[in-house]
Curated annotation (Swiss-Prot):
Reactions this protein catalyses: N-(5-phospho-beta-D-ribosyl)anthranilate = 1-(2-carboxyphenylamino)-1-deoxy-D-ribulose 5-phosphate
Organism whose genome encodes this protein: Dechloromonas aromatica (strain RCB)
Covalent S-S links between cysteines: none
Annotated NCBIfam families: PRK01222.1-4, PRK01222.1-6
Protein name: N-(5'-phosphoribosyl)anthranilate isomerase
Length: 208
């Protein structure tokens, strides 16, 4: 099965173009103001114009007021919501949009129980645990992922072109999600890194 690829944290037209040209399946926009990758819904609406049909638009939120999420959903065609804070299932389900729930993996976290708390989530996005919110570019121990996880698995956390092939072969996620691993600086993407990452995923797919 083809591993889906999401490039997250885009802020510039040329970076959206590069991700689409490389073959990304989804483009993620960060609507979390403290993040250096933050874009306003109005700015994202401009960037979305460069995304062709059948490439998903993902909106990432962290403990946001519901009205803010609704405003973003009205401003641009978000296909999937992604929640990275302390949101519960009732919160995540209220927007009538498919959603991913992020889990920050650490020893002691029961991922099966966590996934069971979000039965209507389209998938569980697994990231490394860091203090505060947002990705830290760290890889977590993939052996902490249980084989009986009752959700589609999206793998994130410290992925790069160098390690994503191993990740795809070992974890077999339905999708991989990358931000800092394809950056020149925070919020600015490196187009050669994007192309190399996508190529590494496709090569791994061919070997499975």
């Amino acid at each position: 099965m083809k591993t889906r690829i999401k490039i997250c944290g885009l802020t510039r037209e040329e970076d959206v173009d590069a991700a689409v040209a490389a073959g990304a399946d989804a483009i993620g926009f960060v609507f979390y103001p403290p993040s250096p990758r933050y874009v306003s819904p109005q700015r994202a609406a401009e960037l979305v114009k460069r995304i062709p049909p059948f490439v998903d638009v993902v909106g990432l939120f962290v403990n946001e007021a519901p009205e803010v999420v609704r405003i973003a959903c009205e401003a641009l065609p978000i296909n999937v919501l992604q929640f990275h804070g302390d949101e519960d299932a009732a919160y995540c389900s209220q927007f009538a949009r498919p959603y991913l729930r992020a889990a920050r993996v650490r020893p002691g976290l029961d991922l099966v129980e966590f996934a069971g708390s979000f039965p209507d989530a389209r998938g569980l996005l697994l990231d490394a645990f860091v203090e505060g919110y947002g990705g830290g570019g760290h890889v977590f121990d993939w052996t902490l992922i249980p084989p009986n996880l009752p959700s589609y698995l999206v793998l994130s956390g410290g992925l790069t072109a160098d390690n994503v092939g191993d990740a795809v072969r070992r974890v077999r996620p339905v999708a991989v999600d990358i931000s800092s691993g394809v950056e020149a600086s925070k919020g600015i993407k490196d187009h050669s890194k994007i192309a190399a990452f996508v190529a590494a995923v496709r090569k791994a797919d061919e070997s499975i």
